[in-house]
Design a protein with these regions (language model features):
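Small-molecule-sensing regulatory modules
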Residues: 1-55, 59-60, 67, 85-89, ...
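Short, small/hydrophobic-residue-rich motifs at membrane-helix boundaries and re-entrant hairpins
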Residues: 25, 63, 76, 85-86, ...
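Short, well-structured alpha-helical segments in soluble
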Residues: 64-78, 169
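A short, hydrophobic beta-strand-centered structural micro-motif
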Residues: 72-73, 80-89
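Detector for glycine-centered tight turns/loop "hinges" at secondary-structure junctions
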Residues: 77, 130, 278-279
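A conserved helix-loop-strand patch within extracytoplasmic ligand-binding domains
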Residues: 86-87, 94-150, 199-200, 211
């Protein structure tokens, strides 16, 4: 049975660019299919990233460059939710009272080459050596330098329209620019795409191509209203990607990249971390992971989990280990409340190991069935989420396993030397916030 919203009007926060407004209107269009009588008011807000168009993003020295001001208005209850390009939403720093309430079906996550119109060329390989390629993304620059060392890479800031104008100004010296395929297509600029770069050359950004909707974690009405927009395969992929980034650390200043595929065979995920000039990198993958099987079973122990890992999310414990733990050492386990809207964290009984979620979802929350006696100190109110994503109506085993997959892949990169690359980046001349 479809949820009936409690309000007749919702205020939507968005950036002021044409692309942001197009994306917001696309969300309103989808919502009208389910709630034709609801009114939506669009509130335009300028962010730090919109105000500072001179410095490279990595040099501004802040996370949430395109989200912070929107979150301030959300926190003040001036708006009800925000439409983001999910790649702009930090995985490591999200205000504690905010959550991603829905993720829509992902568009093409790849990067595109847009060549200046006076060049009669169709790909990067056709451009002469020394051509100037415009991009402000450290992820793109590092991978492009690795695969196309013959070019010069130059900062090109601004929204999509501004960057297009800069590319068309011959005095500025750009021969091409790199942009997300999804953004170009949403603006109906398909004819400006000269080449699409395949992920085997340039992996894409975490969440690229997906729209995420951020709201207050205690605004259950909005969360339920938005849940109809969740696209399960996209949610699962993006949770894995965001968990990967959260474990690696960093934001737009750190060249990290992914590729994910989720189908009937399971999840395939590639992850990569590079230094700023692409001369050093670590890369690994996990593949064919059946997310319907709890990751804490032995089925995945040899093919999935990292040996000698100190990461709490990746530890495997047998019943004996759990029984021998003291009460203050027990891992917290997610449990349901009698409410159908919130969940809590409570310690599991010492006598038995944690039981992974089965086929229940966030939309169906039964009563607690445990012999443990709970007190106020035992129960901690917490909205159920995975990498800050609330996947209402999606099997929670899938969501939890997707989060574990991303975390595991990040730990594998750490064991391959990601820590030393991160240290090199932090000591470089680029101003980078500590992850």
């Amino acid at each position: 049975m479809q949820y009936v919203p409690l309000r007749s009007k919702y205020k939507i926060g968005t950036r002021q660019s044409e692309l942001a407004l197009v994306q917001t209107e696309s969300v309103i269009y989808q919502l009208h299919k389910f709630y034709p009588d609801i009114e939506y008011e669009v509130i335009k807000i300028k962010t730090i990233g919109d105000k500072n168009l001179l410095d490279p993003l990595a040099n501004i020295g802040d996370k949430g460059l395109f989200t912070k001001e929107l979150e301030v208005e959300l926190d003040r209850n001036n708006i009800d939710f925000v439409v983001h390009s999910l790649k702009d939403v930090p995985s490591t720093v999200l205000p504690p009272n905010m959550i991603i309430g829905a993720i829509l079906e992902r568009a093409d996550p790849r990067d595109a080459v847009v060549i200046a119109p006076w060049h009669k060329k169709n790909s990067l390989n056709e451009l002469p050596h020394g051509s100037v390629i415009g991009t402000s993304s450290t992820r793109r620059i590092a991978q492009l330098k690795l695969n196309y060392p013959q070019f010069i890479y130059k900062n090109i800031r601004g929204n999509m329209n501004t960057r297009w104008e800069k590319l068309n100004n011959r005095e500025l010296g750009y021969d091409a620019m790199i942009a997300a395929v999804a953004g170009l297509q949403r603006l109906k600029w398909n004819d400006r795409i000269s080449e699409i770069i395949e992920p085997d050359r340039v992996l894409y950004a975490i969440g690229q191509g997906a729209l995420g909707i951020e709201c207050r974690h205690n605004d259950i009405d909005t969360i339920r209203m938005l849940s109809v927009l969740n696209h399960e395969p996209t949610v699962i992929r993006c949770i894995a990607e965001r968990a990967f980034l959260r474990r690696i650390g960093g934001g737009c200043s750190i060249p990290n990249a992914v590729r994910t595929i989720y189908n009937e065979k399971g999840l395939v995920m590639d992850g990569m971390l590079l230094n700023l000039d692409g001369s050093r990198f670590v890369k690994d993958h996990v593949e064919n992971l059946d997310l319907t099987v709890p990751m804490t079973t032995t089925k995945h122990a040899t093919t999935f989990f990292v040996s000698n890992s100190d990461d709490e999310l990746l530890s495997i414990e047998d019943e004996t280990q759990l029984t021998n733990r003291s009460s203050n050492q027990r891992n917290l386990k997610r449990k349901r409340t009698e409410s159908d809207i919130d969940s809590v964290l409570i310690p599991p009984p010492v006598q038995q190991p944690p039981t992974p979620p089965s086929s229940t979802t966030s939309a169906t929350i039964p009563s607690i069935t445990t012999t443990a006696t709970l007190t106020e100190t035992d129960v901690i109110p917490l909205l159920r989420h995975y990498a800050h994503v609330c996947g209402v109506n999606i099997n929670e085993t899938l969501l939890e396993n997707a989060e574990l997959c991303g975390t595991n892949l990040a730990v594998k990169l750490m064991q391959l030397g990601a820590d030393s690359i991160l240290e090199e980046i932090q000591q470089s001349s680029v101003v980078i916030p500590t992850p």
